[in-house]
């Protein structure tokens, strides 16, 4: 007990520092707007990503980390194993996992397939116009400089509107080298190397990447090579029979007096310097 008491002042300081950081960020949002603050945060994260090695980018590893989830899409063409990134894309990950456990995706078709681009599913209507999130409303894109539309990426499909993520998702299938398209956009070296194996860089920051295929890309390619009609819908009915949650993730709920409410997502990270 004495040892615990010894660290109480330090814990209090860290909590106050964290709340101070959150308070200042909220003030900045109120004065300058969300876009300004979000861009500033993203720029700071990008600077860190540009200096990082391969291990900083979870898509580049086939291993499922302790802070990651794992699912298997059992399709009519075979299994696709995907790991999810709840700490980097909390909303998209929670949405997908809850839908999977509720069997929302069971029996849905791959309604849109574009060869050498991507395969898309998650729409109960089967035509690209349906589906909703677990919150019954759309949610915003979660951009991060640590996740990209490289080959095998799992991402949320949206309409282009500000908060239009629902239930639809796509898997990037393109195999062609995309590294030359990156130019001087500031991509981290490990990601440039990954794009040499294919991907869709035009989708970066526009769509939320929240997972990566770690097994079953041959199945993705099989679906990607299907014959389609003029609306990019496969002429052969290919379905997601079920989505098995192999490794779940517990999303923590944090209550603070500052906000007077609930903040749901990933556990708070006290910044090194507030």
Predicted segments with their positions:
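Cyclophilin-like peptidyl-prolyl cis-trans isomerases
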Residues: 1-274
